[in-house]
Amino acid sequence: MTNVFHHVRNFIEQQPAPAKTLEKSSSPNILYTALPKHWRSNKSFQEPFYVVLLTPVPDNTEVSIWAGNDEKPCEEVRNEKAKVHRQVAKFNDLRFVGRSGRGRKFHLTIVIHSAPMMVATVKNVIKVTVDGPRDARIPKPQGSLKRQAEQQTIFPNDIIRTPGPPMPMTMIPPPWFPLPMTQTFPPSFFPLISPGPHPSISAALWKIHSESMKTPIKQKVEQENVSLNTSTCLSSPSIFITPTSDDRKLKRPSSPRSITKSSETSINLIQETPESVESKRRRNVSITSSNSSSPTIWRPF
């Protein structure tokens, strides 16, 4: 018995670090080296497969391996036989040719042909398929999605991950709040805002945001529209005849006095701005120049 433990100890010390892990079987006297969880059909393993015996067994005793499950009780295994040498049976090129099936694994049966015969079984040892272990056909990069979600957040990670009381509803900014920090914001704008419910802050921020988004072309167009609205019309003002209440009762045409009175009340005199005066002069000059060159053609500009 002392020789058995001596041989087993020497075997474990001589093996590299990955092969030192021995798995237990249904028999306490039979151990085996770990196998991969998933493997390809008819492919040799990277490391030899060992069966270690803790009971004294003479050398050159045959050890065989059987594989199967509920659907396939006995599948083909190549190089499934080995000889015992110093309590260790080494399988150099063990291959599982049969396939365990979809979602199923092989049960392993280790048989030591000694007197008496010893049998050990291990359930759900290895899964054998045609392709072997491979990546999914439609990968789901969960890590990249999480990174994109973190990048889309408006707050830094240290603020989000720190545990603390929930933020009150009055302090949560609207979705358009993260504006670019440009020259449109004066330096003294942010210190003026104190924490607390301010109903006029959102309107002020929206106004500042809309003004900051205006382009030079848009501002120029707005200025031109304002100048056109305030400029005076060169054509003669139209005279509106508004019948009085007496005329309506008598059903007679309105008098010339009412015509003059209505014309005075209907015409609104607009104060001329420097821009409107310049535009008026420009139009007058263009009219005179066009009359001097060709009196039949009128050129507004």
Swiss-Prot record:
Q: Which InterPro entries match?
A: AML1_Runt, p53-like_TF_DNA-bd_sf, p53/RUNT-type_TF_DNA-bd_sf, Runt_dom
Q: Which PROSITE patterns match?
A: RUNT
Tissues expressing this chain:
Expressed in the intestine.
User: Does Cytoplasm show up as a keyword for this record?
Assistant: no
Q: Name one GO biological process term.
A: negative regulation of gene expression
Keyword vocabulary terms for this entry: Developmental protein, Nucleus, Phosphoprotein, Transcription, Transcription regulation, Ubl conjugation
Give the subcellular location. Nucleus
Task: Please give the residue ranges the record annotates as the region Disordered.
Answer: 237-301
Residues carrying Phosphoserine: S255
Superkingdom of origin: Eukaryota
Q: What does this protein do?
A: Transcription factor. Binds to regulatory DNA sequences in order to modulate transcription; negatively autoregulates its own expression, perhaps dependent upon CBF beta homolog bro-1. Promotes proliferation, and prevents differentiation, of seam cells, a stem cell-like lineage, acting in concert with bro-1. Required for controlling cell proliferation in the seam cells, perhaps by repressing expression of cyclin-dependent kinase inhibitor cki-1. Inhibition of seam cell differentiation is regulated by rnt-1 and bro-1, perhaps acting upstream of pop-1, by antagonizing pop-1 repressor function.
Q: What Gene3D superfamilies does UniProt report for this protein, alphabetically?
A: 2.60.40.720
Question: Which Pfam families does the record cross-reference, listed alphabetically?
Answer: Runt
- Which residue ranges are recorded for the region named Interaction with DNA? 40-44, 95-103, 128-137
Q: How does it assemble?
A: Interacts with CBFbeta homolog bro-1; acts to increase the affinity and specificity of interaction of rnt-1 with DNA. Interacts with TGF-beta pathway protein sma-4.
Q: What happens when the gene is disrupted?
A: RNAi-mediated knockdown causes embryonic lethality and missing male-specific sense organs, known as rays. In hermaphrodites, RNAi-mediated knockdown causes a slight (5%) reduction in body length at adulthood.
- Source organism of the structure: Caenorhabditis elegans
User: Where along the chain is composition biased (Low complexity)?
Assistant: 285-301
Query: Which protein is depicted?
Result: Runt-related transcription factor rnt-1
Q: How is it modified after translation?
A: May be ubiquitinated in order to be targeted for proteasome-mediated degradation in intestinal cells. May be phosphorylated by members of the p38 MAP kinase pathway.
Q: Which GO terms describe its cellular component?
A: core-binding factor complex; nucleus
Q: Which GO terms describe its molecular function?
A: ATP binding; DNA-binding transcription activator activity, RNA polymerase II-specific; DNA-binding transcription factor activity, RNA polymerase II-specific; RNA polymerase II cis-regulatory region sequence-specific DNA binding; sequence-specific DNA binding; SMAD binding
